[in-house]
Amino acid sequence: MTREEFDTLCRDDVRRAVEENLGRDPLAVALDRRTPHAALVATQVKYLERARTKLPSYYAARCILPPRAFEQASSEACAAHKEPAGDTALDLTCGLGVDALALGRRFRRVVALERDPVLAAVAARNLRLLGAANVEVVCASAEEYLAATTERFDWV
C-alpha cells in the first residue's frame, strides 16, 4: 500500500463507501463506477470480510488492512495466547499491530517497531481506533532502534 492509497482510505467519503459495500462481492464493488476509488474500496471490503474471523477487533473498528500485512499478521486468537505481562514490552515487528494490541492488554507500555513508513502509519491509526493508547508505534528497524535506545524492556 502506498502513502497515497492510505491517505485516500482515511477520507470520510471512502470510509463510507467501504462501510456501504461490506457484504458485497469485492469484484462487483471494483467494477461499480459509482463507488469512489472502487479498486481500493473493493480490496478493503475483501480484507475486512476476511478479518471477521482472523481479526474480529479490526473488523469491528473498520481498520485499514493492507493486503500483504493482513496475510502476514497473526490472528487475534493466536496473539492472545502470548503469556507475558509486565511494565514495558517491545514488539520488534509491528506489521498491523496485532501482537502489539495483545501485549498492550498485559503491559503498561508497548513500543511497536515497524520499518515501513506507510505500514507504521496504518498500524498507528488502527491501534488508535482500537483504543490501544499505551502502544506507541515507532517507524524504525529493530536494529536502528536497539542501537539508539537506552530504555530497558521487560519483554522483547
Could you describe each region identified by the protein language model?
Residues 1-156:
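SAM-dependent transferase fold signal centered on methyltransferase-like domains
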